[in-house]
Every structure is written in structure tokens, then in C-alpha cells.
Design a protein with these regions (language model features):
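Detector for C-terminal structural segments
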Residues: 310, 316, 320-327, 331, ...
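Gly/Pro-rich hinge or "lid" segments in bacterial periplasmic/extracellular proteins
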Residues: 119-144, 249-345, 466-475, 664-668
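Surface-exposed binding/hinge segments that line
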Residues: 206-295, 644, 651-652
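Ser/Thr-rich, Proline-interspersed low-complexity disordered segments
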Residues: 12-15, 20-59
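Ligand-site clamp/hinge motif
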Residues: 170, 303-307, 334-385, 517, ...
């Protein structure tokens, strides 16, 4: 086994030196947003790059894909100039990905019939494709928050101490069905969706309230004209723009939705009598709001079968397929981006994602050369197999950075068991489990050395492997008695175990869980590992039925949606209390409220300024003092699979950032 690990390590080292430019250092966590300049101008600031006044012809003279040119010639589509906005988003070096991540960006060429093949393991959900399709309202390179520019929205202006935000839309921007995108789509979203108690009982989302707080003061929308609108807050909301970039994987649908379609299913515009037939088809009577929810496709829904034909502004649009297991996405003829030569993006015609049984089956498709791009289901544990099959499969394994902490133990501290709550809510118990983890063994055997100790999220002291200290802490908690198998009894004298259910969301989670179960025996903790279907895992988590799990975690500094994502796993009922403004769930203890208050203060301040950064450091200190979840490793490398023919594939930075720049991928020879 040691020999195999040594050989595998050599393979991974060779990968780093060859595919990653001689071992470039890992990209840092996205830097905080630069302070927003107090705007003085009365006109909209210009986009970072202007579209050519007259687009320069590409090398082959084509400014649109052959499949679209054929439709124009047949009279099935308007000419390209009529499909693009007056000022398209211009893509070139450093726009979607920084030049540090992609130093050799090149303008691509169309290939008629080009397809990106990928695979997914969850029914009606293709995560790699979702990320490729998701378009935020605003954008910054590398999924960061520095250098925020327009995206779906053309531009913005910030005034009055970060209280007034004016947004400028792209005149001539169209939905994928050819209808114009205007401020009516914004007004409808704000007033008729968020302002309707049936559709949104809690009203405006937290992201549109001061401090990103469900109880914060709401913003006020003002429509200026067909392409200009303003959102005003009663107090500073310095980091509001971050919520329009990519926080929480949100997309433009948080703010802009196709009113011309959705009004058909809304009783403010369509009498309920006209909805009766469709209500009956869906086994509904008067519940028009439920029907509306089924017709409304938000950014998370774009790969779901019910969204076939739904208008979007994404680069590819879901098409009908002969099999529900095969998802086909075809280029959007009205997509709003062009490259520096004037060619409409995306370069590639289609994405096809095939559903298979599980993550292992997804990886099997990689090895047999049936995948052109994959990130979501890869793992370092698979790298030796990837490297062995690269030539045969026609792909490269690109070692990039993971945007999350890849493996974290979440103890659901609100799981409905009094003894469990007593123990899991005591920081000594969480520290004991952390000390029992032999991280060196995990880093060597699972990550081949390409991971580090969780210095930010757990800290040096509590991530040290110290079985003696772990046992002492458990003794302090009254867990001094053991059963015949050497497992500790609970402080009540009854058998004690931790059921760790996981959905095998990534290849490394199951082997890590099994290794942890062995390591926990050294401190007398019965760590029971159970793999369940990933959809069932989500349902059990939502219902507060998971006692514990192993999953990835976002930035551990108590910040924005990342805190909420983690809170939903280490304190499900606390999370419900927060997101419902105290109407449901369980009120969290003071140490959790402290993080929520700091989170609100950070959102009110401007990212990158002194106050914001100081609060971030306080967040790390809070994390290390309380260890709300037990992060196993940080700074993990992430293998991404890309066809040897794909171009504009990054060599550094976050792997997932390549998904978000999928429209600039193209096939070379």
C-alpha cells in the first residue's frame, strides 16, 4: 500500500509539473471587494471594454455560429445585429478569468456541430452545466469580488455613502425567445413576486435588505426608464454589489425574470378562471401560487426538465431530449456576449450531459473517454487513474484550486436528542473530535500531500493530533464508562454513537469517512458511517433528521451565505430561526448570534475597507474558538478534466471558475 501511495504521489507530482505550468502556487482566496468609489458623474460609467463600432471579422469571416447563420438564411432568425444588445459584453484576456489564471487566452473559432460532453449522477440536476449556464447580474474575474463590472446588467453607479445604487441595463438585450429584457422584468420580480404574500411570504430576500439580514430594512426600487432603475437603502449597505456577483451562487433571476411569460401564471395579470385548466392538470384547485412556482425557473432550475423552452439569457438553453437521462443544451441565439473580434459567444454549439448511477459511474465515463469536461465529481483520490487513462481517453487532468474546504464534519447540534444536544453543543466535545483526527494520514493517503491543516477554520492548537487530550476532554464531559467493545457510553450511562450519513457527493468523502471511523476508535467514539442517496440526504437535512454528516464547507469566517450554508448543517433549527426571522426553528445560543451580528455588520461595511477586514479577522478568531464544524483540511487541490482539444482552459485559480467561463471554451486541433 505504501508503495502504491508513493507511486501515486509521483504521478501527481508529474501532473503538477506538466499540466499546471511547473507547479504554480495556489491562488489565494478571492480578495475582498475594492471600496466602491463615491460616484459623482450623472451618466452611466462605461463598460470595461467597448464592443467594436463595426465588429472586426474573424479569421474565417464568421461572426456567428454556422448553425445560427443557416437559420438566418432560412428566415428562422433575425440577423445577428438585431439579436445582440447595442453594447454587448466583450470578452477577451482577463475578463472572465484573470490573466494569472489564464495567461494564454485566445479568440476561438466555431466548429459546426461542436459538443461538450459531460455527466451527472443526480436525476434532473446537472451541476457542472448549471455552473456553466448561471449568469449573475454583475461579474468580476475568477469569481472574485474585486473589479466588479457589468454582466447581464450593463453597469452601475454607487452614491450617497453606499445607500443609492443605480443600475443600467443593456438596451436591446433579449431573452432566448427574442423578447426584450427591460426594467419591466425587474419591476415584476420586485413587486409581483417578492411583493406577493402567496409567492414570497417573507417578502424581499435578505440580499435586498440592509446587512443581508432577513430582518434588515428593505431596499426601495425606483424605475427610471425602460433600461435604468435604482435601489435605495435607508442606511449604508457597502457590500450590496457582492450580492449581485456570485454570492451563494445566485444568478440574474434574483432580480430579473421574464415578465412576459410569468404574467400568464399570476393572478395580478391573468384571471384565475383562465388558469383552471392548468391548475386541474397539476392536481390543484385555487393554489395559483403553487402553479406559478412550477412555471417559474430560477437560476438553480435551468437544468431541470420542466424548464425546457423557458426564456433565459444564459449561453446555452435546455432542449427536449428523447431520454430524461440525457440533457441537451443548445446555444442561445440571443446571447449578449461577443469576443474582442466581434464573434458571438459561446463558441461551442451544445452541451450534452448524461445521467449515470453515481459519482463512481461519472468517473468511469472519464476513464473511457466519454467526457470532454468534468469538475463536479472529480477527486484527488482518482488522479492516478486519470493520468493512466489520459492518452486513451483524449483528456488532460488539470490540477487547480478547490473553492471550498473539501471535507468537513458537521455535527447537527439541533438534532432532536437531549443527550446529543448536551454533548454536541459543548465546544469541548467538538475539540475532542478534532484532536482525534490524524490529519497527516488523511493528507497523505487521500490527498497525496496536496492539502493543508485547517489553520483558518480550526487553528493550529485544535487541529493538532492529540489522542491524550481528546480522551481527557471526553472524560471531563462525563463519558468515562465504556461498553464491551471499548466504545464510550454517554454521560447518561447509555450506549452512545454518532451516525454520520453522507451522500457521496465527491469521491473523497467516503474514504475519508471510513478513515475517520477508524481514527475515532482510538478515543472510544462509535462513528457509524452510512452512505445514502444524495437527494435523500438533502431531504433529511432539511427535516433536521441528520445527526451528523461529512460534506464540503465554504469560507469559514462567518461571512454571508457561506455562514448560512454551514449553519444549515451544524445547526439546522438555528438556521431556520434565522432565515424565518424567528417565526420558526429554535433560537440559537449567544455564540451563534454573535456570528450572525458580525455577519450583518460586515455586509453593511464596504468589502476591502478597514472595518470589513477587521470583522473578517474576528470571524476567524470566532471560528477557532468555537469550532462550529470540524474542518479536516484546507487549501485542497482539485483535478479538472478537459478534452485535449479544449482551448481557454485555465492553468491556475479555482477549478469552478472555468465553469463560469464556459462560453469562452472552444475546440482547437
Amino acid at each position: 500500500m505504501k508503495k502504491f501511495r508513493f507511486l501515486s504521489l509521483l504521478v501527481v507530482l508529474a501532473l503538477v509539473l506538466s499540466a499546471c505550468g511547473g507547479g504554480a502556487p495556489a491562488a489565494e482566496q478571492p480578495a475582498a471587494e475594492a471600496p466602491a468609489a463615491e460616484a459623482q458623474a450623472t451618466e452611466a460609467p462605461k463598460e470595461e471594454a467597448a464592443a467594436p463600432a463595426e465588429a472586426a471579422p474573424a479569421a474565417d469571416g464568421a461572426l456567428e455560429a454556422p448553425m445560427l447563420a443557416a437559420k438566418v438564411a432560412a428566415g428562422e432568425l433575425p440577423a445577428l445585429a438585431e439579436r445582440l444588445p447595442a453594447e454587448p459584453k466583450v470578452i477577451g484576456p482577463g475578463v472572465l478569468l484573470s490573466e494569472e489564471s489564464l495567461p494564454d487566452w485566445t479568440a476561438g473559432q466555431y466548429q459546426d456541430g461542436s459538443v461538450i460532453r459531460t455527466a451527472h449522477s443526480v436525476a434532473d440536476w446537472a451541476p457542472d452545466v448549471f455552473v456553466m449556464l448561471n449568469e449573475p447580474a454583475l461579474h468580476a474575474p475568477d469569481l472574485g469580488v474585486q473589479g466588479i463590472k457589468g454582466n447581464v446588467l450593463k453597469d452601475f453607479l454607487v452614491e450617497e455613502d453606499n445607500k443609492v445604487f443605480t443600475f443600467y441595463m443593456r438596451e436591446g438585450l433579449k431573452w432566448s425567445d427574442g423578447e426584450p429584457v427591460t426594467t419591466e422584468d425587474v419591476r415584476f420580480t420586485w413587486e409581483n413576486i417578492y411583493g406577493n404574500e402567496k409567492l414570497t411570504p417573507a417578502g424581499l430576500k435578505a440580499r435586498f435588505r440592509v446587512g443581508n439580514d432577513p430582518k434588515g430594512e428593505p431596499g426601495v426600487l425606483e424605475i427610471i426608464d425602460d433600461y435604468t432603475f435604482k435601489i435605495t437603502y435607508p442606511s449604508p449597505y457597502g457590500s450590496f454589489l457582492r450580492n449581485l456577483v456570485i454570492e451563494g451562487w445566485n444568478g440574474y433571476t434574483e432580480l430579473i425574470n421574464p415578465a412576459h411569460v410569468l404574467k400568464k401564471w399570476h393572478t395580478d395579470f391573468t384571471p384565475i378562471e383562465e388558469l383552471k385548466e392548468e391548475l386541474t392538470k397539476n392536481n390543484l384547485t385555487e393554489e395559483w401560487w403553487t402553479l406559478f412556482g412550477q412555471k417559474w425557473c430560477q437560476n438553480w432550475d435551468v437544468t431541470r426538465e420542466r424548464c425546457i423552452g423557458y426564456p433565459t439569457v444564459n449561453p446555452w438553453v435546455l432542449q427536449a431530449s428523447d431520454s430524461p437521462a440525457t440533457k441537451i443544451f443548445e446555444r442561445n441565439p440571443y446571447y449578449f456576449k461577443v469576443d474582442v473580434e466581434g464573434k458571438q459567444l459561446p463558441y461551442i454549439d451544445k452541451i450534452v450531459s448524461q445521467q449515470v448511477e453515481d459519482v463512481e459511474a461519472v468517473n468511469l465515463k472519464v476513464l473511457t473517454g466519454e467526457v470532454d469536461f468534468l469538475r463536479e465529481s472529480t477527486g484527488l483520490v482518482k488522479v492516478p487513474l486519470y493520468k493512466e487513462n489520459e492518452e486513451k481517453g483524449g483528456f488532460n487532468t488539470v490540477l487547480l484550486d478547490m473553492h471550498v474546504d473539501s471535507s468537513t464534519i458537521f455535527l447537527n447540534q439541533t438534532f432532536d436528542n437531549p443527550v446529543w444536544q448536551q454533548l454536541s453543543q459543548d465546544v469541548r466535545f467538538r475539540k475532542a473530535l478534532s484532536h482525534a483526527i490524524n490529519r497527516d494520514e488523511i493528507i497523505e493517503s487521500i490527498y497525496y500531500g496536496f492539502a493543508g491543516y485547517p489553520m483558518k477554520s480550526v487553528g493550529e492548537e485544535n487541529s493538532t493530533y492529540d489522542v491524550e487530550q481528546a480522551n481527557a476532554l471526553l472524560d471531563e464531559l462525563g463519558m468515562t464508562e465504556k461498553d464491551a467493545d471499548g466504545f464510550r457510553l454517554g454521560p447518561d450511562g447509555e450506549p452512545f454513537s454518532i451516525l454520520v450519513e453522507h451522500g457521496a457527493h465527491a469521491p473523497d468523502l467516503e474514504p475519508i469517512a471510513e478513515l475517520l471511523a477508524e481514527q475515532m476508535k482510538d478515543i472510544g467514539i462509535n462513528f457509524q458511517i452510512k452512505r445514502i442517496d444524495s437527494q435523500l440526504w438533502g431531504q433529511r437535512n432539511d427535516a433536521n433528521e441528520l445527526q451528523a454528516t461529512i460534506f464540503w464547507a465554504h469560507d469559514q469566517n462567518g461571512d454571508n451565505d457561506r455562514l448560512m450554508g454551514n449553519l444549515g448543517l451544524f445547526g439546522r433549527q438555528w438556521n431556520t430561526w434565522f432565515t424565518t426571522g424567528g417565526a420558526e426553528g429554535v433560537e440559537p445560543p449567544a455564540w451563534v448570534k454573535e456570528a450572525l451580528d458580525r455577519n450583518k455588520a460586515r455586509w453593511e461595511s464596504v468589502a476591502g475597507e478597514e472595518q470589513y477586514n477587521a470583522l473578517a479577522e474576528e470571524g476567524y478568531a470566532w471560528q477557532q474558538a468555537n469550532i462550529p464544524q470540524i474542518t479536516i483540511v484546507e487549501d485542497v487541490k482539485y483535478p479538472m478534466i478537459a478534452s485535449k482539444r479544449l482551448r481557454n482552459v485555465p492553468s491556475a485559480g479555482y477549478a469552478i471558475a472555468c465553469n463560469f467561463a464556459g462560453e469562452q471554451l472552444w475546440y482547437g486541433e
